[in-house]
Amino acid sequence: MKAIYPGSFDPITYGHMDILKRASKIFDEVVVLVMKNINKRYFFTFSERLSMVEKAVEGIQNARADSYEGLLVDYARKAGIKIVVRGLRAISDFEMEIQVAHINKAMYADLETVFLMTDPKYSFLSSSIVREAASFGGDVSLWVPPYVEEALKRKFSGST
């Protein structure tokens, strides 16, 4: 059974990767889908985010990266995927995610959402926290892979 793990991944963190690795043990294939949310302003470009996700899936045999600029349900339907994986850090995540899951289900009746609780050591972690810490020169190596840390340093130094 295939699953989609969608997100902005701006940038991908060890919290995202924890959910990905655990999902890859449950499902036959996991597509990590880099998406655009019209309500978000991104730090990294779409292609930069996809490139980082491609590196993140390299060591996971049954995971692959992809990107899409439309509705998740449209991608899922076209790809024949009926499972969406989402990570939850706190009850506030659940409140938003349950709404999205219901909307997705209304648009694609066969689509189910599976929630995985994040590892407690990542329960505070978000891409925005990583970006903020990196913007002040903080050490983000506990939260992101080395290639993401380097990309953050390049962006904040102005040498993209």
Swiss-Prot record:
The keyword Cell cycle does not apply. The gene is coaD. Belongs to the bacterial CoaD family. This is Phosphopantetheine adenylyltransferase. Its EC number is 2.7.7.3. SUPFAM superfamilies: Nucleotidylyl transferase (SSF52374). Reversibly transfers an adenylyl group from ATP to 4'-phosphopantetheine, yielding dephospho-CoA (dPCoA) and pyrophosphate. The record marks 16 as: Transition state stabilizer. PANTHER family: PHOSPHOPANTETHEINE ADENYLYLTRANSFERASE (PTHR21342:SF1). The lineage of its organism: Bacteria, Thermotogati, Thermotogota, Thermotogae, Kosmotogales.
